[in-house]
Amino acid sequence: MTKITNDLFLKAARKEQVDRIPVWYMRQAGRSQPEYRKLKEKYSLFEITHQPEICAYVTKLPVDQYGVDAAILYKDIMTPLPGMGVDVEIKSGIGPVIHNPIRTFQDVEKLTIFKPEIEVPYVLDTIKLLADDMLDVPLIGFAGAPFTLASYMIEGGPSKNYHQTKSFMYREPEVWAILMEKLGRMTANYLIAQINAGASAVQLFDSWVGALSRADYAQYIRPVIEMIVKEVKAVHPTTPIIMQAVGASHLLAEWETMPLDVVGVDWRETITTARQKVPTKAIQGNLDPSTLLAPEKCIAETERILQEGILEPGYIFNLGHGVFPEVPPEMLKKLTKYIHERSEILLKKG
């Protein structure tokens, strides 16, 4: 396995002192890069992720081009679902489309047991390739969290208000619990397999869970997240686990009492107030990705965020959501350089 010579990200995830703030960007690998767009002329997303050499190349690009302090595996949160019998297609301009959406108990019952080594060996091969030969920074594996996966599976695709998902949850609580159990087992096994293959940390993407109230989260979602985190920690107790959601500041207190290591926040919450809600966790975030298209605003916001981030150990610079396709790669390169240089100065000042 390649020795990790830049462990700033892992130190920050453990709330240890660092000499500069680590940075990586959600969706740093992919759609904003010319090299990736050229690949997409020939291959679909799933075709790229099924070819370890190509997928590893895409994953490593931002490390080489931007100088980020961590790589995140290039794949989609939908990747494991076909292994459970879900007929999913990624449609250009739309996103994931489910051709056999969940509507009844029978639909949930049909979901099959997911075995990562059998269903997604190409994901594990990509991780091994990166960890063994290609990276000197930590590699982050990830999975979609059960609520977000269920929202696609029930709605049949992207949704603005998740009313089909929430009404199913309210109307069929026992069936919902079975669905969460199946997705939770899949997610735990998937994350454990990624760490076994060489991932240094893992992130749970619960992109749409902010649509729920805190009371609904505590009743319908918290049990499965606790199960996932506890199962991963039982096998890999020192591997950092990150929780990332959008528009979910009202749920921060729920995550404070779980054995998570890092909590991602978006631009709706400041780093300072987030720390008050999750004092035992490292914080990741929280630049609005829209500012990447407005350079002066981007630098001003980055400076403000860094001033808050350096006040305590355990801060990782990131976006509050993914990089937009329109963002020039040069902007991410310049921003990374600014974060590294500026944070080093600020930390020396103390």
Swiss-Prot record:
Residue runs in coiled coils: none
Keyword Cytoplasm: yes
SUPFAM superfamilies: UROD/MetE-like
Site positions (Transition state stabilizer): D76
GO BP annotations, alphabetical order: protoporphyrinogen IX biosynthetic process
Keyword Cytoplasm applies: yes
Highest taxon of source: Bacteria
Residue positions binding substrate: R27, Q28, A29, G30, R31, F46, D76, Y152, S207, H321
Enzyme Commission number: 4.1.1.37
CDD domains attached to this UniProt entry: URO-D (cd00717)
Pathway: Porphyrin-containing compound metabolism; protoporphyrin-IX biosynthesis; coproporphyrinogen-III from 5-aminolevulinate: step 4/4
Record field: catalytic activity: uroporphyrinogen III + 4 H(+) = coproporphyrinogen III + 4 CO2
Annotated InterPro entries: UROD/MetE-like_sf, Uroporphyrinogen_deCO2ase_HemE, Uroporphyrinogen_deCOase
Keywords attached to this entry: Cytoplasm, Decarboxylase, Lyase, Porphyrin biosynthesis
GO cellular component labels: cytosol
Location relative to the cell: Cytoplasm
Functional summary from the UniProt entry: Catalyzes the decarboxylation of four acetate groups of uroporphyrinogen-III to yield coproporphyrinogen-III.
Family assignment from sequence similarity: Belongs to the uroporphyrinogen decarboxylase family.
Subunit structure: Homodimer.
Protein name: Uroporphyrinogen decarboxylase
Source organism of this protein record: Listeria innocua serovar 6a (strain ATCC BAA-680 / CLIP 11262)
The encoding gene: hemE
